[in-house]
């Protein structure tokens, strides 16, 4: 996403009450570069709001088998040492976590999922179940459509307005890496934040 598209996306969520609850998970995604399974697997014990640190040491994986196993979640640990890491939190990311906590408190939502001994997940749906990539991408597609429809209705296609492109959760990880590159961040630092063992 460009800077303008990224701003449009987050402004849209904040200005539309029915979508504001999605803001924290997507904001954290776009401002930490974490993989979607790392985000959905985050527990409150994995973050330190005082020190401003996110500890990444596991991934939540959703299996959709078309056999007797059916659909289920599992926890995986990183394949490489680089995958296990600490990510510094910006003030915006910290506020997103606090926003999520406040939203859940007001809506009387709490994590009810237990996966391979892991519980107290941060990002859960209204039933207290962990989120999965399919549901997050579905929410993205709907918000892209609604946002673009609203802009085109207001300004018309001839005005060449900023619109949201088609994108997925994984694109938010790329967007984070792009913003780091644009800021002149050291490649080794980018590699460590993203959890890559080798530079591409």
Residue ranges, per PLM feature:
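Basic, Lys/Arg- and aromatic-enriched nucleic-acid-binding interface segment
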Residues: 1-42, 50, 61, 82-84, ...
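C-terminal catalytic core of Y-nucleophile DNA break-rejoin enzymes
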Residues: 2, 55, 64-65, 75-99, ...
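Short, basic (Lys/Arg/His-rich) helix/loop patches that form interaction surfaces
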Residues: 7, 11-22, 32, 87, ...
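Flexible loop/turn segments at secondary-structure boundaries
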Residues: 35, 62-64, 131, 200
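Residues in the helix-turn-helix
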Residues: 38, 53-55, 189, 200
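A short, basic/aromatic helix-end/turn motif that makes direct DNA contacts
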Residues: 41-47, 191-197
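Short secondary-structure boundary/capping segments
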Residues: 46, 76-79, 112-113, 161
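Short, flexible, mixed-charge acidic loops at enzyme active sites
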Residues: 60-74, 112-113
């Amino acid at each position: 996403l460009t800077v303008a598209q990224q701003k449009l996306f987050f402004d849209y969520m904040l200005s539309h009450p029915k979508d504001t609850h999605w803001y924290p998970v997507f904001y954290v995604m776009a401002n930490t570069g974490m993989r979607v399974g790392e985000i959905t697997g985050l527990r409150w014990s994995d973050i330190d709001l005082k020190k401003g640190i996110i500890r990444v040491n596991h991934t939540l994986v959703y299996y959709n088998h078309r056999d007797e196993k059916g659909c289920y979640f599992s926890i995986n640990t990183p394949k490489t040492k680089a995958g296990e890491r600490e990510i510094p939190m910006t003030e915006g990311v910290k506020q997103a976590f606090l926003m999520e906590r406040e939203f859940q408190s007001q809506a009387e939502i709490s994590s009810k999922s237990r996966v391979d001994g892991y519980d107290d997940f941060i990002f859960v749906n209204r039933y207290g179940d962990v989120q999965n990539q399919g549901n997050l991408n579905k929410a993205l597609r709907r918000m892209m459509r609604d946002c673009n429809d609203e802009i085109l209705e207001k300004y018309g296609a001839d005005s060449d307005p900023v619109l949201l492109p088609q994108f997925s959760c994984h694109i938010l990880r790329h967007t984070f890496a792009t913003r780091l590159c644009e800021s002149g961040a050291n490649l080794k630092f980018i590699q460590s934040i993203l959890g890559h063992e080798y530079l591409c």
